[in-house]
Amino acid sequence: MILLGVNIDHCATLRQARYRQAEATAGGPIEPDPVTLALAAERAGADGITVHLREDRRHIQERDVWRLRESIATRLNFEMACTPAMTQLALKLKPESVCLVPENRQEITTEGGLDVTAQRDRVRACVEAMNAAGIQASLFIDPDEQQIELAAQLHAPCVELHTGAYASSYPQPTSRTKEFQRLRMGAARAHELGLIVNAGHGINYVNIAEVRTLPHLHELNIGHSIISRALFTGIDEAVREMKVRMNP
């Protein structure tokens, strides 16, 4: 069975669109609350909760991750830039897992996989720190053989394959087939190297029918499509429907 990690970043995006000041000046309850949403997602069957605390704090805030750490019953997957400050925060937070992702202040959302080659020493230091602390470290990378092999060399126990290029090419059959084959080969190579294989980015209620057939999948991290569907159906139904489509 493929596990579902629900990314709740965009609940915080909606909150921050209205409330950017301190809670004391908000004039009442601040909604929507990401922690409340996370608990509802868990009740609906989410196997874990994923949040990305960006360095620019554009959506999830540090207080959110600490409240989540204290509140949720499943697993906390903490997405973070590979920086000394974030590494120290993660070691204090002690989530079940961290996922190292690239960040660009001009991007709307994460635009590609982490370039492990360019940040080899920094990634190694972070992975070693997480391994020593008993926190599972995952690298969010494109399905590129060189990146996957380097992840294994740096002793990362897990990779999350970036499915964004596949999702973007979905309407074009030729490009879609090419990108899906890259994902298949990447998943197979990661598995050969003993890595846990996760995937995420751009997965929705349509392309999940194909994504779920990728070999050796352990977990999918899905956010925007679930939060979008929840606006119409509620978070319970949105999570349950995705779980059904992932594991029919």
From Swiss-Prot:
<feature type="active site" description="Proton donor">
    <location>
        <position position="201"/>
    </location>
</feature>
<comment type="pathway">
    <text>Cofactor biosynthesis; pyridoxine 5'-phosphate biosynthesis; pyridoxine 5'-phosphate from D-erythrose 4-phosphate: step 5/5.</text>
</comment>
<feature type="binding site">
    <location>
        <position position="7"/>
    </location>
    <ligand>
        <name>3-amino-2-oxopropyl phosphate</name>
    </ligand>
</feature>
<comment type="function">
    <text>Catalyzes the complicated ring closure reaction between the two acyclic compounds 1-deoxy-D-xylulose-5-phosphate (DXP) and 3-amino-2-oxopropyl phosphate (1-amino-acetone-3-phosphate or AAP) to form pyridoxine 5'-phosphate (PNP) and inorganic phosphate.</text>
</comment>
<feature type="active site" description="Proton acceptor">
    <location>
        <position position="52"/>
    </location>
</feature>
<feature type="site" description="Transition state stabilizer">
    <location>
        <position position="160"/>
    </location>
</feature>
<keyword id="KW-0808">Transferase</keyword>
<feature type="binding site">
    <location>
        <position position="54"/>
    </location>
    <ligand>
        <name>1-deoxy-D-xylulose 5-phosphate</name>
    </ligand>
</feature>
<dbReference type="GO" id="GO:0033856">
    <property type="term" value="F:pyridoxine 5'-phosphate synthase activity"/>
</dbReference>
<dbReference type="InterPro" id="IPR036130">
    <property type="entry name" value="Pyridoxine-5'_phos_synth"/>
</dbReference>
<dbReference type="InterPro" id="IPR004569">
    <property type="entry name" value="PyrdxlP_synth_PdxJ"/>
</dbReference>
<comment type="similarity">
    <text>Belongs to the PNP synthase family.</text>
</comment>
<feature type="binding site">
    <location>
        <position position="59"/>
    </location>
    <ligand>
        <name>1-deoxy-D-xylulose 5-phosphate</name>
    </ligand>
</feature>
<feature type="binding site">
    <location>
        <begin position="223"/>
        <end position="224"/>
    </location>
    <ligand>
        <name>3-amino-2-oxopropyl phosphate</name>
    </ligand>
</feature>
<comment type="subunit">
    <text>Homooctamer; tetramer of dimers.</text>
</comment>
<feature type="binding site">
    <location>
        <position position="109"/>
    </location>
    <ligand>
        <name>1-deoxy-D-xylulose 5-phosphate</name>
    </ligand>
</feature>
<protein>
    <recommendedName>
        <fullName>Pyridoxine 5'-phosphate synthase</fullName>
        <ecNumber>2.6.99.2</ecNumber>
    </recommendedName>
</protein>
<dbReference type="InterPro" id="IPR013785">
    <property type="entry name" value="Aldolase_TIM"/>
</dbReference>
<feature type="active site" description="Proton acceptor">
    <location>
        <position position="79"/>
    </location>
</feature>
<dbReference type="Pfam" id="PF03740">
    <property type="entry name" value="PdxJ"/>
</dbReference>
<feature type="binding site">
    <location>
        <position position="202"/>
    </location>
    <ligand>
        <name>3-amino-2-oxopropyl phosphate</name>
    </ligand>
</feature>
<keyword id="KW-0664">Pyridoxine biosynthesis</keyword>
<keyword id="KW-0963">Cytoplasm</keyword>
<feature type="binding site">
    <location>
        <begin position="9"/>
        <end position="10"/>
    </location>
    <ligand>
        <name>1-deoxy-D-xylulose 5-phosphate</name>
    </ligand>
</feature>
<feature type="binding site">
    <location>
        <position position="18"/>
    </location>
    <ligand>
        <name>3-amino-2-oxopropyl phosphate</name>
    </ligand>
</feature>
<dbReference type="GO" id="GO:0005829">
    <property type="term" value="C:cytosol"/>
</dbReference>
<dbReference type="GO" id="GO:0008615">
    <property type="term" value="P:pyridoxine biosynthetic process"/>
</dbReference>
